[in-house]
Amino acid sequence: MSEMSLAAGDIELLIFVNQKPDFPEPCDACIAHGELGLRKSCPSLDINLGCSGYVHGLWIAHAMIASGAVSNCLLLVGDLCARATDQTNRKAAQVFGDAASATFLKRTEEERTATFVMGCDGSGWDKIIHPFGGMRLPYDAASIDLSVEDAAGNRWTAQQGMMKGEDVFNFTMEVAPSLLAEIIAAAGWKKEDVDLFAIHQANKQIVENVIEKAEIPAEKAPTDVFSKYANNSTNSVVMVLCDQPENAELKKTIFCAFGIGLSWGATAVDLTGLYNGGISTYVPPVNRMNREQQIEHWIKHFKGE
């Protein structure tokens, strides 16, 4: 906000996309609203989605602005995927990374391309899942210390999610290439005219397979962002954008994301005049409470002290 000279009172809508909130309730958007000191007339809400989450956030923010309900929106997206993964699990620990992003969208009088194609196949809801900890299967004494090893010796616990890798790969190869073709056609573009294809960085092999099957220009579809920053889930596609050179020509950009749900989304957007803040390392605030201090804080809260 400081880099774009935005005041807290300027924000009209706050959307927060994540899957691993600070607390089961309240939503992180309300917490962020208070931390940022936004005005009380600024509605704030969470969206619980993973790898397709950034595109879903853009879609809803764009729809709210296009409808005239608000003239701008601050879209926050972030998850701690690596922190939530058992680091001894070689199947998962080497895949995920932590990241957060902030995107400010506002209405302009100038016509700009902003086309979306969204979808969901709920029959695959259990292909990527964190089965414990919700109201259907709350943690209890039997599950909190649960530890299971798969055939490869990877340890899985109730505190982490799981994925049916082969099923998710097949889903990706079925959905992503056709999704790219559909969004290009919906925007009225030609694939060779697109400046950047920001494809969800599930892993390098998957991105390369999607590029090949979709027959899009490989030089315009980065695959090395996964190698640099891992799979950032909700932030994966925007990491591709932020990793571009400051002077990159990104007038015609396509975001293509797919994952948990099973869900997917793509957007074709004109990013002329975009301010790209790049990528930086997160530095935690020095006054943040550690785990022991937080526990003590809530004990006092329960006691009414």
Residue ranges and their predicted role:
Residues I11, V70-S71, V194, L250:
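Short, high-confidence coil segments that cap the C-terminus of an alpha-helix
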Residues K20-D22, G34, R39-S41, I47-A66, ...:
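Claisen-condensing/thiolase-fold acyl-transfer catalytic domains that form or cleave C-C bonds
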Residues V17, N48, C73-D79, L105, ...:
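Short beta-strand segments
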Residues A66-A100:
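Flexible, glycine-rich active-site loops centered on histidine and acidic residues
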Residues C27-C30:
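Glycine-rich loop at the start of a catalytic domain that most often binds anionic cofactors/ligands
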Residues N89-N170, E174, S178, D270-E305:
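Condensing-enzyme catalytic core mediating Claisen C-C bond formation in acyl metabolism
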Residues M1-E12, S178-D193, Q244-P245:
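Phosphate/pyrophosphate-binding loops at sites that engage ATP/ADP/AMP, CoA/4′-phosphopantetheine
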Residues D10-D22:
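Short beta-strand-loop/turn "lid" adjacent to the catalytic site in phosphate-handling enzymes
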